[in-house]
Regions:
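Cys-dependent condensing catalytic cores that perform Claisen condensation/acyl-transfer
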Residues: 62
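Conserved beta-strand-loop surface patch within small alpha/beta domains used
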Residues: 1-59, 67-103
Length: 103
């Protein structure tokens, strides 16, 4: 298991039942605050956290959790394409990872 995933799982468990959100920066997990109006259904990374991540190094991927175990959504796929970054989605109840690649 990639090291960042251990930290991301811990963050997802701490944030449950809300979606956790973070970034992979230089191979390490960078937790971010989810400022979505409905954080149990989706996520929006706090722009201050995103800026701090950019200053810390190269943003390599977006990470977020699905607290209810729902599969990767069409919205996730579309957002992944828009960011042009790899996305990792962690299903909390299933303890399973999904990866989305930008196309």
């Amino acid at each position: 298991v990639q090291d960042f995933k251990r930290e991301a799982v811990r963050h997802a468990e701490e944030e449950h039942p809300k979606e956790s959100a973070g970034l992979v920066v230089n191979g390490s997990y960078f937790p971010c605050r989810n400022i979505a109006p409905d954080p149990e259904a989706n996520f929006v990374i706090n722009p201050v956290d995103y800026a701090r991540a950019m200053l810390a190094g190269t943003i390599e991927a977006v990470v977020h959790s699905h607290p209810q175990g729902t599969p990767v959504s069409d919205h996730d796929r579309k957002a992944c394409r828009q960011t042009k970054l790899l996305w990792y989605v962690y299903s909390v109840p299933d303890k399973q990872w999904s990866t989305i690649k930008p196309s």
